[in-house]
From Swiss-Prot:
Pfam families: AAA_2, ClpB_D2-small, zf-C4_ClpX. This is ATP-dependent Clp protease ATP-binding subunit ClpX. One of its GO terms (biological process) is proteolysis involved in protein catabolic process. GO terms for cellular component: HslUV protease complex. ATP-dependent specificity component of the Clp protease. It directs the protease to specific substrates. Can perform chaperone functions in the absence of ClpP. Zn(2+) binds at residues 13, 16, 35, 38. Belongs to the ClpX chaperone family. ATP binds at residues 119-126. CDD domains: RecA-like_ClpX. Keywords: ATP-binding, Chaperone, Metal-binding, Nucleotide-binding, Zinc. One of its GO terms (molecular function) is protein dimerization activity. Residues 1-54 form the ClpX-type ZB domain. It comes from Streptococcus sanguinis (strain SK36). Component of the ClpX-ClpP complex. Forms a hexameric ring that, in the presence of ATP, binds to fourteen ClpP subunits assembled into a disk-like structure with a central cavity, resembling the structure of eukaryotic proteasomes.
């Protein structure tokens, strides 16, 4: 309802002293008022202070050896890959600190994103997650197979940045220094010539779209997620300091490496390496091999750090079950301890779990599901049996020929 303007009704901002006629809006609080201009100024001050906090957080980046030690607490094996990642991550955040303090005429350091190549279940995603957690930076995972070119059904590449913003609670400054892991990059390898008359909407086109944000650009990110809200106000995100780790299994790339090295397999010749040594070729991969696989050279050029992961062995998988701080065996022991029940695994039971994971070609990723299958009845029945004090998992319990052993008080 309109009111007349006079001195008795004039409202003034408690911070800057301007009256309601001099600003667009005045908000009333508990015995105080604030105008829209002071709100905007306060937001700017908070943004600057948060940005300074982000810079301070990253000013003392753990050295490569310290990062490696952290990774060793959680990740078994893959020593060469862990060293490569530790050096690359350290150099990345050192580069950010250098650019924040450098003079105009100083050398400009280019960003070194990372390409991880390794079989399913070898630990690619877990390595990236562990690095981000150890640095306390926002982290997002994207599946390359869900991405399509703009104008086609599917996710735009900008949605990857939205996930990072969400992980940073929409703190843009923190998001701009985060880590993004793009999985299944090998599944969008460029198709060969004349393979199909249809457009390759999830292959080379997506690689080109990824290239733009990986190399560094100011991207317009839809806060509500893409195409359903075309009128929404975009958030501007600068990707020049975001570390991109791109991973994939690259099944069959060993053959490309063998051909390049002149060791093409023909029959069962004496000069051929044994099949179980194929993983050694992973350490010989160069950019030429990745390009032949179907990744465009421009994208490869933005991924100068290669980290090759080996196929995990039975011994590796057994160690993964037992040794890390968050080892699966420790997790299930903690679950049963809540019911005052002790859980033990025979050594040959752990070997059987590892063998099953290798047979299923699931690597470390499949260990949990095998334990769940083995312990389903135990976890259902034991909480209701107050006299049970110990559960022992044997090899026979894992292979299904017998049940776990229950010991009562």
């Amino acid at each position: 309802m309109p009111t007349s303007r006079n001195d008795d009704m004039m409202v003034f901002c408690s911070f800057c002293g301007k009256n309601q006629d001099e600003v667009q809006k005045i908000i009333a609080g508990n015995n105080a008022f604030i105008c829209n201009e002071c709100v905007e100024l306060a937001q700017e001050i908070i943004r600057e202070e948060l940005a300074e906090e982000v810079l301070a957080d990253l000013s003392e980046v753990p050295k490569p050896q310290e990062l490696l030690n952290i990774l060793n607490h959680y990740v078994i094996g893959q020593d060469r890959a862990k060293r490569a990642l530790a050096v690359a991550v350290y150099n990345h955040y050192k580069r950010i600190n250098y650019h924040d303090s450098r003079e105009e005429e100083d050398v400009e350091l280019q960003k070194s994103n990372i390409l991880m190549i390794g079989p399913t279940g070898s630990g690619k995603t877990f390595l990236a997650q562990t690095l981000a957690r150890s640095l306390n930076v926002p982290f997002a995972i994207a599946d390359a197979t869900a991405l399509t070119e703009a104008g086609y059904v599917g996710e735009d590449v900008e949605n990857i940045l939205l996930k990072l913003l969400q992980a940073a609670d929409f703190n843009i400054e923190r998001a701009e220094r985060g880590i993004i892991y793009v999985d299944e990059i090998d599944k969008i390898a460029k198709k060969g010539e004349n393979v199909s008359i249809t457009r390759d909407v999830s292959g080379e086109g997506v690689q080109q779209a990824l290239l733009k944000i990986i190399e560094g650009t100011v991207a317009s990110v839809p806060p509500q997620g893409g195409r359903k809200h075309p009128q929404q106000e975009m958030i501007q995100v600068d990707t020049k300091n975001i570390l991109f780790i791109v991973g994939g299994a690259f099944d069959g790339i060993e053959e490309i490496v063998k051909q390049r090295l002149g060791e093409k397999i023909i029959g069962f010749g004496q000069n051929n390496r044994a099949i179980d040594e194929d993983s050694s070729y992973m350490q010989e991969i160069i950019s030429e091999d990745v390009q032949k696989f179907g990744i465009i050279p421009e994208l490869i050029g933005r991924l100068p750090v290669f980290a090759a992961l080996e196929q995990l062995t039975v011994d590796d998988l057994v160690r993964i079950l037992k040794e890390p701080r968050n080892a699966l065996i420790k997790q299930y022991q903690a679950l049963l301890s809540y019911d005052d029940v002790k859980l033990e695994f025979d050594e040959d039971a752990l070997q059987e779990i590892a063998n099953k994971a290798i047979e299923r070609k699931t690597g470390a990723r499949g260990l949990r599901s095998i334990i769940e299958e083995t312990m389903m009845d135990v976890m259902f029945e034991v909480p209701s049996q107050e006299n049970v004090k110990l559960v022992r998992i044997t090899k026979e319990a894992v292979d299904g020929t017998d049940k776990p052993i229950l010991e009562t008080a």
